[in-house]
Each structure stands twice: as structure tokens, then as C-alpha cells.
Amino acid sequence: MLILCAINLLQAGSVFALGQDREDGLPGMPYRTPDEKEFRVCADPENMPYSNEKGEGFENKIAEVLAKDLGKELSYEFWLDRQGYLRNTINAQRCDVIMGMGSDVDNLRTSKPYYRSGYVFVYRKSSNYNIKDWDSPDLRKGIIGLVGQSPPAIALRDHDLMGNAHPYRLQRDLNLPPSEMIDDLVAGKNDIVIIWGPIGGYFAKQSKEPLVIVPIPEFKSEQNSLDTQKGKLEFNISVAVR
């Protein structure tokens, strides 16, 4: 699958060959000079399990494989994944690709998906909960932590569970660790957490408190046809190029 990704990137052509308008990024930042021998990746320097400056994330490892398959030298443009991330990185021509983007992201070309993931329920093993899906009775017994305005919020609403919700910011507070939701679960601030699979699995595995992780079945809203896509819980992930 990784080799197919590399082939797809080659077929897509160089980011600099595409005739799209360039956004300038922040004032005073120099433009990057293209190098045919370089495979430059935009990534967050503090976003495990995906990436960090030490190259320990799984997206770092996939980028290494792609660079090797393409016969190029891997390099990075690190930028915190905040508002303006695309504008200040790939759209400002400071890299060739971004790993781990949704396959249907607007304004960027994407490779064939190299993995698919969804959301998970995470809860303390000591709670003796038995949660398998949205209709599980134990889901109504406690406080449910989730990112506000994320796709699972539609399912939470449709199952009359909004009263149990403990919402978190859509854009992470950089003063807090990426493990914040799992840390709060362990500390008893939440009884259940609904979180994106790779993040939940990574931090749950590191927890000293035994935690249960349950993949959430795909969901489609029945209340409003406009919510069908918003209620989607599983997504294809690709490499994005301009």
C-alpha cells in the first residue's frame, strides 16, 4: 500500500508544477527553493502519535518509506497544526506533501488512502461498563468527554446523550498535552471518552490505569439528511499534495 502511495505521488507530479495560486504564509518568511532530490514534508513537531521533531511518530515512519521509494532525501518543515496550517505550509510552497490528511480534503490533491480509521469509546476497566455501540445502556451512566463539533457529536445528539457531554476544544490548547482527554478519564473527570482511534489507542496504551478501547460502529444520522456526512465516523486518510 505504501508503494502504491509513492507511485500515486509520482503520477500526481511535483507540487511546484501545478498551476495553482500561491498563498504567501506569514510576512517575512522566505520562499522555499525547490530541490528535485528532496522529499519535504510538512508536519506538526508535537503531535504524537503522528509526528514529532524526533521522527518518532507513525506518520514520520511512513514518510521515511515514501522518501526511500521515491529515491529522495527526507526533510521537514515543522509547523504547529493550528488555524492557518495549510496556508503557512504546503500552500506557501514550503513542502511537497502533508501526511495524514483526509482523502476528501478541499483544495489539495490526495494520494490513494493508506489507512482508514474511526472513533473509539474509551473507559476505565474498573468501571465494569460494557459499551459496544450507541445503544449500550452503560453509555447513559456517566460523563462523556469528546471534542465539541466533532463528528460523534451528531450521534450523541441523535441518541439524546448531549446532557452527558463534556466538550473539549476543537483546536487543542498548546499549553495542555495531546493526552488531555485520556488524562482526564484516568483522573475521573470523565467516565467515557469518545476520541479519534489513533489518538485514543496511543495514549490509552501508555496509561497506568487499565482502559478499555472499543471501535465505534459507523453511524448515519436519521434526523436530517444534511447531517449524514457530518455524522460519519470513519474516514480514509491520504498523503496530500498541492
Q: In which residue ranges do the predicted regions lie?
A:
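A short beta-strand structural signal in non-transmembrane regions
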Residues: N236-R242
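Alpha-to-beta junction loops
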Residues: K72-E73, N91-G100, K141-I143, M181, ...
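Short, well-ordered beta-strand segments
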Residues: R40-D44, G142-V147, V193, A240
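Bacterial N-terminal signal peptides
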Residues: M1-Q11
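Extracytoplasmic small-molecule ligand-binding "clamshell" domains
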Residues: L18-D106, L174-N175
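Signal peptide processing junction and immediate N-terminal pro/mature segment
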Residues: Q11-G19
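Acidic, polar ligand-binding/catalytic clefts
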Residues: E64, K68-D69, E73-D138, Q149, ...
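Bilobed "Venus flytrap"/periplasmic-binding protein-like clamshell domains
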Residues: P45-P49, E53-K68, F121-P177, P198-I199
